[in-house]
Amino acid sequence: MTELRQLLQRLSPNLRYALLGELQGLNGQAPSEVAKVSDADLLTALRSAIGDAGRQRRRVVVTGLGAVTPVGNTAVDTWDALVAGKSGIARVTQFDITPYASQMGGEVKNFDPSNRIPRKEARRMARCSQLAVIAAYDAAEDSGLDIESLDKTRVGVVMGTGLGGMDLYNNIIAESVRSGENRVKSRPLEAINGLPNMPAFHISQTFGARGPLNTIVTACAAGTQAIGTASEEIRRGSVDVMFAGGVEGLIVDVFYASFEAMRAVSTSNDDPAKASRPFDAKRDGFVIGEGAGVFVLESLEHAIGRGARIYAEVLGWGQSADAYHIAAPDPQATGAAAAMRAALADANISPDAIEYINAHAAGTPLGDAHETKAIKDVFGPRAYQIPISSTKSMVGHLFGGAGAVEAMACVRTVYTDTIHPTINLEYPDPECDLDYVPNVARKAEVNAALSNSFGLGGQNATLIVGKFRE
């Protein structure tokens, strides 16, 4: 094995990362170097690589983007607002926020689901399902797909969410207490509509998608993992088209009370637009937000066959677990770094290929420093040369929807060579000393972009997208 290991050390960076990708499939995460792998695992990975040599996985491209967010009710409006550095955070209006220490949120404005969803059906849905379906319409129209002409058995849906329709259950309980009657008995389907898998179901029902139907429930990592999972379905050939993304609709009192008790949310109520301050020395917690992001993903062959506009290619993704604490990040940042390395291995590229990072960056004192450390661990001295920005500085933390909206920002970045800023970054923090694109958007060529999502429960996910090249 000594001679073999010496040969492996002379592999090109891309070939070495291909081997690391095989090792990721074997062990669940990629090691940082081939030298750290046992002889047995190395031989297994090599056999797998040789066996798969004639079976190239299908390429996955992004052809449609949809969004409903605190800064825009379409993906186009959302992107324009992000580039302009517009905050969507204001005092909460959906319930009486007065008793709570954190009184602002990233609410979707002027949202009327009945513009696209029959009014009776919309009334039954949880807010997360309403947001998801409207974002899916936006994505479908943006893609130019002729839905009715598709083989619906080869169209699937994967959505991520943290808590699904908690707002529906919150309202059912509150109204039952007020009225003294069991509201569930009179409206049985309303309770079912609060289940976490309902956003995916409603998208499937709306478009008649009869392929794989899945829901990822991994808190703040859910949207990113949903896009990665959907990409895998296309890669292995089980479908041609996937709707994929994430959603959350949790501007509700129980959610505010919970995070207030954890002391996790910002209490800078005097100026809500400046409350979300990722990487800033005066950051004091995240701001709760709501919204949805949905992608239309296609196999490259399917997209080219119908003459689709292609925004970007999904190059790879990775995931890991901290196995440390239910809410706090691992101080060593090993899990976050492992997710990034796994995504690089899956994409078969070296760290030097990444030219932009959309950070998880929620604005918590521990979390932002933790992510900065992880980025330095993966990229070394070059970390200081990579532009990094936080979408959450403008929309707040969308939980299950965050990863999808932030991945959308990455896609638009590689498509337009424009990087949106991190707003409210005014006071440098010595622990957060990288290039966070403060306050003003930037033009720069970006061939590959990386998006991080780190969820409660220590769930880490990273997605990499790149410019499409035939």
Regions found by a protein language model. Give the residues of each.
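Short, well-ordered amphipathic alpha-helical segments that serve as non-catalytic structural scaffolds
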Residues: A132-S143, P199, E298-L300, Q332-N348, ...
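Phosphate/pyrophosphate-binding loops at sites that engage ATP/ADP/AMP, CoA/4′-phosphopantetheine
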Residues: A139-D151, A303-I310, M340-Y356, V378-R382
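Active-site-adjacent elements of ketosynthase-type condensing enzymes
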Residues: L42-L46, I97-E107, G164-N171, G249-S276, ...
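ACP-dependent fatty acid/polyketide chain-elongation machinery
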Residues: T2-E121, S143, E301-Y311, M408-T422, ...
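Conserved beta-ketoacyl condensing-enzyme motif
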Residues: V62, V83-T218, V247-Y256, P351-G367
